[in-house]
Each structure stands twice: as C-alpha cells, then as structure tokens.
From Swiss-Prot:
Exhibits GTPase activity. Binds RNA but is probably not involved in ribosome assembly in mycobacteria. Residues 13-20 are annotated as: G1. Residues 60-63 are annotated as: G3. Monomer. This is GTPase Era. The gene is era. PROSITE patterns: G_ERA, KH_TYPE_2. Residues 39-43 are annotated as: G2. It holds the Pfam family MMR_HSR1. The lineage of its organism: Bacteria, Bacillati, Actinomycetota, Actinomycetes, Mycobacteriales. Gene3D superfamilies: 3.30.300.20, P-loop containing nucleotide triphosphate hydrolases.
C-alpha cells in the first residue's frame, strides 16, 4: 500500500459471535461493550484503528436477528443502514459453532441490502477449537459464501492473525486522508461510553430475561465542588418490571453495589480521574415496545 487509505468497516453476524471483542482488540482499548449475552450492543460505536499507512473506522453494530419488539426492529434498521454506508463488511462466524440458519439468513440480508459492498468473512474464536476444527469451519464457510470468498481466521482473545486481518481490511479501503486525528480512538461521547460500561457491569452474570430490558441513562456528570480530582456521575438503570428491579439491586442492595464498583473502575480508566458513581434503578414499563419511551431512552 503506497498511498494512504481510510474508510469504514462494520462487523456483522448473529448475536454473540465476538464482534465487540474483535473491535476492542483491533482498536487496542475498550470502545464496545462485551458480554456473553446476545444483543448487548445497541449503538453503532466507531472505534478507530490508526497506522502509518491507513486508518480503519470500525462501526460496531448489534447482532442481526429476527425482531420481536420495536427496539429489536429499530436495532435491525440501524444495522441495515450501516451495511449500505460502509466500505467493507466483515461477516463474523465463530469457529466453535456449526454454521446454521442464522448465518445463512445474515449472509442473504447482507447481499440483499448491500450487494456491491466488499465482503470479508472473519472466522472468530479460533483459540477455542483444535486446528482441524478451524480447517473444517473454513471449508464450511467457503461453501456458504462461495469459492471466491476472502476468509480470515482470527482470535481476538490471543491476538492470533489480527495483524493479517487489519492488512486485509485496509487493503480494501479507498485511498484518502484520515477522517480522525491520530490518537483519537472513538467518536462516541463520553456519556454514551459511561452508560455502556454501567450496562455491561449490570449484565454480568444475570439471568436471561434481563439484557433486553435494561437501559442506562446518565443523569448528570459534574466535577465535585471542593475537589478537582473527583467527578460525580449520577446514572439511572431502567428495567421493565418490578421483578427485574429486584434482580439488579440484589439482596440488601449487594448486587447493585457490585455493579457500581465494577463500573466505577472502568469509568475511572475512561476519564482518567477518580469517580463517585451514584446508581438508581427505576421501572419504565414495557419500554422496548413504546415509541415514546424508546425515544426518551436514546433509541
């Protein structure tokens, strides 16, 4: 690559295929929420990969799925808009699961919505299976996509093949100047990142019914009046039902304290200063199906 290249890449795939982990590994810092719960990414977060010869802007999308709620429909619409606006689509398929109807459906969606966009298939999580399983998956992917498919196996966890993937993606971008200054790693507002970090901490280790029902809104961020090394962050966690409120708070508030501690440490890393984090839990009944409430909660 002689001339500088820059452009937009989005990782797509069914929920839980390692897209957010891959984004964070390539950027080198945490810009996308990771959780072993499907459907945990809700905003298209742009992570930025800087090199001397290129700049890749990674757009992280929610996993495509057949929607059951208005929120699900809005997330899918967001994904489809993203498909048609990027330079390269990276379809993520995990090495440790057989290709299924979900992968086929997503491939069809990509080709229907963005038939001309360059497609690279990324076989993720190769550290989780033996080499022969990886080889078998590469063959299966080739059968799904076609013999001309560009396929790159990677592990975001160990870093294996990430440099190869970066070069492949960069090689497919158009020549052009950098979109963002060197050193900038995301264009997400700090408040959005803070809300996502709190949401990630709250989702850790909880039962399946909660992830889709949890939204976090940053209510207020202000420097502490008598101390210049402390920032007060007030946030509200919204759930849909009383029973979910109990799950988030835990017995005697123990669970909410754990969430607060985990999130505070991540937010302190993000802001580079000490943080006092105040969390409150409120009920917003059936917010996923209510257009007014979706708007109020930032969707």
């Amino acid at each position: 690559m002689s001339e500088f290249r820059s452009g937009f890449v989005c990782f797509v795939g069914r929920p839980n295929t390692g897209k957010s982990t891959l984004t964070n590994a390539l950027v080198g810092t945490k810009v996308a929420i990771t959780s072993n719960r499907p459907q945990t990414t809700r905003h298209t977060i742009r992570g930025i990969v800087h090199r001397d010869e290129f700049q890749i802007i990674l757009v992280d999308t929610p996993g495509l799925h057949r929607p059951r709620t208005l929120l699900g429909q809005r997330l899918n619409d967001l994904v489809k808009t993203t498909y048609s606006e990027v330079d390269v689509i990276g379809l993520c398929i995990p090495a440790d699961e057989a290709i299924g109807p979900g992968d086929r459906w997503i491939h069809e969606q990509i080709r229907a919505v963005a038939p001309r966009t360059t497609l690279v298939v990324i076989v993720t999580k190769i550290d989780k299976v033996p080499k022969d399983r990886v080889a078998a998956q590469l063959m299966a992917v080739s059968e799904l996509i076609g013999p001309d498919a560009e396929i790159v196996p990677v592990s975001a966890t160990t870093g294996e093949q990430l440099d190869v993937l970066t070069d492949v993606l960069a090689g497919k971008l158009p020549p052009g100047p950098a979109f963002y200054p060197d050193g900038e790693l995301t264009d997400e507002p700090e408040e959005t990142l803070m809300a996502e970090l709190i949401r990630e901490a709250a989702l850790e280790g909880v039962r399946d019914e909660l992830p889709h029902s949890l939204a976090v809104v940053i209510d207020e961020v202000s420097p502490r009046e008598d101390r210049d090394d402390l920032i007060d962050v007030h946030a509200i966690l919204y759930v849909e039902r009383d029973s979910q409120k109990g799950i988030v708070i835990g017995k005697g508030g123990a669970r909410l304290r754990e969430v607060g501690t985990a999130a505070r440490l991540q937010i302190e890393k993000l802001l580079g200063t000490k943080v006092y984090l105040d969390l409150r839990v409120k009920i917003a009944k059936n917010w996923q199906r209510d257009p007014k409430q979706l708007g109020r909660l930032g969707f």
